[in-house]
Amino acid sequence: MGSKTPGNHRRDPNESSRPPAIDAINPPKQAAASGLVHGSLEGESQKRNKRKKKKKKKNTKELEILQTTPPRVALANIFRSQRYPEAEIVKYSSDNDNLQRTTAEELRHLSVLNAMDDEFLNDYRNAAEVHRQVRQYVQTIIKPGIALSQLAQEIEDGVRALTNHQGLETGDALKAGMAFPTGLCLNNIAAHWTPNPGAKEVILQYDDVLKIDFGVHVNGRIVDSAFTMAFNPVYDNLLAAVKNATNTGLKEAGIDARIAHISETIQEVMESYEVELNRKVIPVKAVRNITGHNILHYKIHGDKQVPFVKTQTNQRMEEGDVFAIETFGSTGKAYLDDATGIYGYGYDENASTAGLHHSSAKSLLKTIKENFGTLVFSRRYLERLGVQRYHLGMRSLVTNGIVQSYAPLVDVPGSYVAQFEHTVLLRPNCKEVISRGDDY
């Protein structure tokens, strides 16, 4: 989920060309292949003894539980040990990563490092595995003719089923589930669009460029990952540019990495691509006013940003940081404006409620705190809980700065925007691209 800069035949995700491979210690684990294990030959007496032995009955409790299609089996029932697979583990390069943390500025991150324990990693890996299984299924059903409301429902139903938290009981959605509303953005709509109740149905077309951006959390540990799909091959270079730019950002990310260097490198890679549309060659441009971002506990947007264009910031990545490395490339002006409508809402826990007088607003705020906390939510999520006549209360919360509203972000009409995104954990001795999968 992109952070807006302050002050203002079919193509699957894995079909675009890849950048040079990252040096991985442990690539994403694959499903184990079944096969026969051949032993050594034994004597006839051993064979006779074996025949006499009774065959052991299969313990049905130990039978492997497989995921369904669509995915609806909770991961806790598949991973009985409750230990979830590692993602892509990448060694730090010695060029820009100082593993000796000695400066006073970094001491403030000790509490973050102490929290990066086995439980932290397992929650993140759990959320990442949910994301992988859900997205790999929806990639098989994304075709021209599908309604975007149906696609959002498939994603969100899958996430809630696999986390085993439907979010209908008070506080249940805070344990695990959707980290923010599913983003389904077509063509020049870059980010922050989701189907809303009562809106006109949107049907996916052959010539559309669709960005799918959704987040999964387990105990507030948020995995934010996005990909783009297009059916018309004329967009291949656009998707390749953005995917390679994102992978470049992931390659450059690390402890002590300068954000300015990462941003400049991302832009250089992305803007080396061109696309030909309607017999006109158009350069792919890095979007200027939306950024990648760090992720905090229960907060999708932290206090650090990773632009996709050259910047003068002196900020560095630090040990213990969690970043959503994402890039957006456009065939338009590569500058986004707010469109009409509301994508979602987010509660600001630091805002004062002193000026809040409407009883409807107070009641709504209580519901928001109990069910979403600081996680971003949409109107669909409120109505799913049975909340009615909330518009006046929501208007009061937004006006008083207690809840922030997010509008869709768009480039100029007729342009096309693509997005790819992964979440990366900057662990003390390696970085883990937690959302990496076989698809992208």
UniProtKB/Swiss-Prot annotation:
Function, as annotated: Cotranslationally removes the N-terminal methionine from nascent proteins. The N-terminal methionine is often cleaved when the second residue in the primary sequence is small and uncharged (Met-Ala-, Cys, Gly, Pro, Ser, Thr, or Val).
Binding site for a divalent metal cation 1: 213, 224, 421
HAMAP family cross-referenced by the UniProt entry: MetAP_2_euk
InterPro entries in alphabetical order: Creatinase/aminopeptidase-like, Met_Aminopeptidase_Type2, Pept_M24, Pept_M24_MAP, Pept_M24A_MAP2, Pept_M24A_MAP2_BS, WH-like_DNA-bd_sf, WH_DNA-bd_sf
Biased composition (Basic residues): 48-59
Protein name: Methionine aminopeptidase 2
GO cellular component: cytoplasm
Gene3D superfamilies (UniProt xref): Creatinase/methionine aminopeptidase superfamily, Winged helix-like DNA-binding domain superfamily/Winged helix DNA-binding domain
Enzyme type, top EC level: hydrolase
Cofactor: Co(2+); Zn(2+); Mn(2+); Fe(2+)
Main location: cytoplasm
Cofactor comment: Binds 2 divalent metal cations per subunit. Has a high-affinity and a low affinity metal-binding site. The true nature of the physiological cofactor is under debate. The enzyme is active with cobalt, zinc, manganese or divalent iron ions. Most likely, methionine aminopeptidases function as mononuclear Fe(2+)-metalloproteases under physiological conditions, and the catalytically relevant metal-binding site has been assigned to the histidine-containing high-affinity site.
Organism phylogeny: Eukaryota, Fungi, Dikarya, Ascomycota, Pezizomycotina
Entry GO MF terms: initiator methionyl aminopeptidase activity; metal ion binding; metalloaminopeptidase activity
Record keywords: Aminopeptidase, Cytoplasm, Hydrolase, Metal-binding, Protease
Catalytic activity field: Release of N-terminal amino acids, preferentially methionine, from peptides and arylamides
Keyword presence, Hydrolase: yes
